[in-house]
Amino acid sequence: MLPERLSNGICSLNPQVDRLTQSAIMEIDKHGRVVNYTITQTVINTSFRMTYSDVNDILAGDKEKRQEYQKIVPSIELMAKLHETLENMRMKRGALNFDTNEAKILVDKQGKPVDIVLRQRGIAERMIESFMLMANETVAEHFSKLDLPFIYRIHEEPKAEKVQKFIDYASSFGLRIYGTASEISQEVLQDIMRAVEGEPYADVLSMMLLRSMQQARYSEHNHGHYGLAADYYTHFTSPIRRYPDLLVHRMIRDYGRSKEIAEHFEQVIPEIATQSSNRERRAIEAEREVEAMKKAEYMEEYVGDEYDAVVSSIVKFGLFVELPNTVEGLIHITNLPEFYHFNERDLTLRGEKSGTTFRVGQQIRIRVERADKMTGEIDFSYIPSEFDVIEKGLKQSSRSDRGRGSNRRSDKKEDKRKSGRSNDKRKHSQKDKKKKGKKPFYKEVAKKGAKHGKGRGKGRRTK
């Protein structure tokens, strides 16, 4: 956000030079509770400029790295222990751990994507996150108790109807959930995600839980943070790249000089909070669209190739499928070899004649048919394989659940009539992808011509 002369200059913690900073200095007990703190202006002079990889290597026992940074190895190990304490504290109080991963799309000098890799989240990354979370909470609680105008980062409780949809969806996987949608606790949601850890559908279930939550936003009123199970929260730790953080730094400085400035902040914070929330949503949407376009551009070179993939979502007009490199595409229902019944209750597609059934988390063999970098759309086709699940002899659903007709031709017509536009399948698929948010990303791309039976990576973590 700030110009590079500032972000990489006087605002950057370069080694062996003094830097003027705003610091939250906290004393934390063995249970992860802040027992004493000071928020003040300080001067920092760092010894080394390190990378996350350096710290992860040190904690993993790399002899060369430990020798290179031997002066601070004890401090790094102590920081890792503190992180573990803070993480355990958050889990015990009910913080939700959305296990999602992010992609890093590598491009050449011309901006053409050449690879898609997984953003690493080792102990070092999580350690810094723990410290930032605690600093944000401490600063927010400080100003709340002073009863001064302030900007908070809030995450309100999810709406009951959205939680009920998640409960219904989770039940389709055989999960027993205790409690009603309006009273379900964060601990129960934690238990659900722990119970499915390692399952093929864990990634999708985690995403469905995330989508059942309300969107975090900025506000002049403190409503706590549901996802973190925190009573107070703000954004304080990233003033270089986020305006609300910069505003918090200004308030710390200005309130330290005079309380009379409170009237000014009381007037401007509501508009700033609304504007910052709106801009954040626009930035996220732009990021998703660009990511989809770059993934489609990357896959243009692989049209016609076959891969093992995993069903990531099932809708009435087809199924979305994800490759091990996190690229997602659509197999439209009209491109399947027979008529398929859509079961909205358990989100399955079942072939009327063969009994071939598709479920979320199931492996599937596909061919890349089309990739459009301008729209970010990717089309796959289904290839029969040893992954196919046959469920014959099952009673078919009622007429209302039989889809959009008894053959593919009438299915197309009914689909157009219900949608009110001829290109319903592409617009629905594009809209559905936009709502999904980020998908899990894996380091290795599926290899061309991979043999049947190749497994899928796992893991998804986010807040």
Task: Briefly describe each language-model feature range.
Residues 1-323, 330-337, 409-413, 418-440, ...:
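Electropositive polyanion-binding surfaces
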Residues 323-326, 384:
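Short acidic, flexible loop segments centered on an aromatic residue
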Residues 6-8, 332-378, 384, 388-405:
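Intrinsically disordered, low-complexity linker and terminal regions at domain boundaries
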Residues 315-317, 327, 364, 374:
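A generic "binding-loop/recognition-motif" signal
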